[in-house]
Amino acid sequence: MRFSILTLFPEMFAPLQASILGRGQKSGRLDLNLVQIRDFATDRHQNVDDTPFGGGPGMVLKPDILSHALRATLQGETAHVVYMSPQGSRFDQATAQRLAGYGHVVLLCGRYEGVDERFIDAHVDEELSVGDFVLTGGELPAMMVVDAVSRMVPGVLGDLESAQADSFQTGLLDHPHYTRPAHWVVDGDHYGAPEVLLSGNHGAIAEWRRRQALLRTLIRRPDLLGKAPLSRVEKRLIEALAVDLDALENKH
């Protein structure tokens, strides 16, 4: 899968050469193409922005320069063009899975006051936001998208089961994880791993993990439960857990 990133700060993407994504690029499963927007400026000062029509603070990225950068990147081929924007739809795991189905995704990183709307109308397939907050540019959100989508590309993760068991893949938050030592003491306090995980009973372990995922989601992200594929037994379990939590809160 190929990612092309249109940005004024390509040096910010160096971390994508490390760890799993770096190995994915070396193996040829991922291709990361960084495009410096300023290379397509037409004046000697390499200006890529201008003041907004109608007045107001800040600068706006110019549509003609962005269009030249995009066309040079595509070279006549097609791609799914995404603009990272606070006005975009919320990026989530389902979106990551969908984007992984494209052979080539172009990510435009905005700066300053944003991008001329005419470029969006002419070239952008969708706008995505990573949350209800404002950053100095679209580079960090673009890195998040590349990371999340790359995990869905076959062969990038060494263990496909790891991606399938991630939070949100099943519609729920992930269950707690434990490793050695089984018994840990810190500052005089004793912390033990759950006995069921040490039992070797795979059925009991799977049941415990599912129950913990349900409980964690109920406590931290109850909004997800309405979308998760749950059995009748799990729905009744959630109702019982909710009653127990309400009773516990009322005690305090």
UniProtKB/Swiss-Prot annotation:
EC number: 2.1.1.228
UniProt superkingdom: Bacteria
Gene Ontology BP annotations: tRNA N1-guanine methylation
InterPro entries listed in its UniProt record: Alpha/beta_knot_MTases (IPR029028), tRNA_m1G_MeTrfase_C_sf (IPR023148), tRNA_m1G_MeTrfase_TrmD (IPR002649), tRNA_m1G_MTases_N (IPR029026), tRNA_MeTrfase_TRMD/TRM10 (IPR016009)
Matches recorded under SUPFAM superfamilies: alpha/beta knot
Catalytic activities: guanosine(37) in tRNA + S-adenosyl-L-methionine = N(1)-methylguanosine(37) in tRNA + S-adenosyl-L-homocysteine + H(+)
Annotated compartments: Cytoplasm
Keyword entries, A-Z: Cytoplasm, Methyltransferase, S-adenosyl-L-methionine, Transferase, tRNA processing
Any one GO molecular-function label of the UniProt entry: tRNA (guanine(37)-N1)-methyltransferase activity
Sites where the protein binds S-adenosyl-L-methionine: G110, V130, G131, D132, F133, V134, L135
Top enzyme class: transferase
Main location: cytoplasm
GO CC entries: cytosol
Annotated HAMAP family: TrmD
Its job: Specifically methylates guanosine-37 in various tRNAs.
Sequence similarity: Belongs to the RNA methyltransferase TrmD family.
Subunit structure: Homodimer.
Listed name of the protein: tRNA (guanine-N(1)-)-methyltransferase
Taxonomic placement: Bacteria, Pseudomonadati, Pseudomonadota, Alphaproteobacteria, Magnetococcales
Gene from which this protein is expressed: trmD
